[in-house]
Regions:
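Compact soluble domain cores
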Residues: 38-42
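Basic/aromatic recognition patch in beta-strand/loop cores that engages polyanionic ligands
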Residues: 50-79
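Arg/Lys-rich, positively charged N-terminal/basic patches that mediate binding to nucleic acids
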Residues: 1-36
Length: 98
């Protein structure tokens, strides 16, 4: 069972990343990269307080964890579970997507 919750938007981000990787490289590469992102989300879920870097300038309490060429953005919920909000490419203007 996942140790985190994930937003609909983050699921869409994940799908778009997978689709882009299939179109650009291959399904095998897309599956590997998807697994890398899934592992990052598992790591966030295991220790959300100590994982990630603060991005309070975007949203108070927002944290980001670098995985491959993407940042997994999340907040820590009242129940101490991570809530994955977005998964964005490292070169994106993050503020535009929140």
């Amino acid at each position: 069972m996942a140790k985190y919750d994930i937003s609909k938007q983050a699921l869409e981000d994940l799908y778009k990343i997978w689709e882009y990787t299939v179109d650009t490289w291959s399904e095998t590469q897309a599956d590997k990269y998807y697994q890398l992102l899934e592992n990052a989300m598992d790591e966030i879920g295991s220790n959300p307080q100590k994982t990630g870097k603060p991005y309070d300038e975007i949203i108070t309490g927002l944290k980001g964890y670098h995985a491959g060429k993407h940042l997994v953005f999340y907040i820590i919920q009242e129940n101490s579970r991570a809530f994955i909000v977005r998964i964005l490419h490292e070169k994106m203007d993050y503020k535009r997507h929140f």
